[in-house]
């Protein structure tokens, strides 16, 4: 049985490092158009992954694009690594650390107990280096130009925030959360609560 991209398919992509979600959609759209010898096809993704994130990206084609909101509304689980003792303006590795914190008092129990405080409904402000739009413009575009923007908080739900490994200053974790959660903000807040 062949794939019918025009009627609609869901494609699961393991997004590579440094690719944007739009890069994946664009490349896939062009490949499908070329393979089927057509000029137009609907292709979209169910949730944005940061360029510096790797992992599952749900791509929908044709009539399946009508279900994108359904898929993007599902809970997500992220696995990552954070460095204790510093933060960056972008909350990730896109920018260099600009704030440093003392870490002598931080131990394994403090990290684990602090992570538990984030489980449940919380208010989170998306980072300025994000795909959130302000007046029709993506925040990351404004941030890269040095434009200061006030970002409103949003309610999100963290279902689990588990610390899987601690090798100071690096901490590995897994986090299961609702739509709209910015993982980089969550671990930046964790680091701030430890100080």
Predicted regions and their residues:
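Catalytic/RNA-binding core of pseudouridine synthases
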Residues: 1-191
């Amino acid at each position: 049985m062949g794939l019918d991209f025009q009627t609609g398919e869901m494609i699961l992509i393991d997004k590579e490092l440094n690719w944007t979600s739009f890069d994946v959609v664009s490349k896939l759209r062009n490949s499908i158009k070329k393979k089927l010898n057509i000029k137009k096809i609907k292709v979209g993704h169910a949730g944005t992954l940061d360029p510096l994130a790797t992992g599952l990206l749900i791509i929908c084609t044709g009539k399946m694009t009508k279900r994108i909101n359904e898929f993007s509304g599902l809970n997500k689980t992220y696995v990552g690594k954070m460095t204790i003792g510093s933060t960056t303006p972008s909350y990730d590795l896109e920018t260099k650390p600009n704030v440093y914190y003392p870490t002598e008092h931080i131990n394994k129990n403090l990290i684990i107990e602090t992570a538990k405080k984030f489980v449940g409904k919380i208010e989170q402000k998306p980072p300025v280096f994000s795909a959130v739009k302000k007046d029709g413009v993506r925040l990351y575009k404004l941030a890269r130009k040095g434009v200061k923007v006030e970002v409103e908080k949003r309610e999100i739900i963290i279902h689990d925030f588990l610390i899987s490994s601690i090798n100071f200053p690096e901490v590995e974790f897994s986090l299961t959360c609702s739509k709209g959660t910015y993982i980089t903000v969550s671990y930046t807040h964790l680091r701030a609560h430890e100080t």
